[in-house]
């Protein structure tokens, strides 16, 4: 007959398990953060491709965005929102946006690290409105989409322009950085140096404050 474990032995085993768990938790959390970052990169790759496909089908024009003002239902943007009231995290309907036929997925609009409850985690460069892909002087350095915040200080309305009230701020959801897609199609993680830097890109002067 096997001798049963003593209370001390059981406590030692429990203590060892607790120590191992404490050692593993940071690594597991970091792995989860990395997985969320990778998922966000994939989202923006799919959205960026949708922008390109739309341009191919519409004589090189970028998809439009809506102007962020309240008091109207905004049709025809890359995402759709109901402006009653001014855009909030709950009144987007991505299935009515002009890019949804290309994405065919609600999930690509949402970063897994975005815990605000918003239906859209990204904002489009405001200078793409009424512009063509061929007008971009430096596609590699000109952001197309970025992660936009949605807090009491800022609003996420599907386009990004810091010269707007409330302010548009980039949000760092991934290891003190953020994921950006660029007009040449590449997507990368970058660290933004100042949340109040001008984010309305001039096509001849791409954002460099990373």
Regions found by a protein language model. Name each.
Residues 4, 35, 194:
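Alpha/beta-hydrolase active-site loop signature
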Residues 1-32:
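N-terminal single-pass transmembrane signal-anchor helix
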Residues 23, 32-43:
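Juxtamembrane interface helices immediately C-terminal to a transmembrane segment
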Residues 38-210:
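Short, well-structured segments within or immediately adjacent to enzyme catalytic domains
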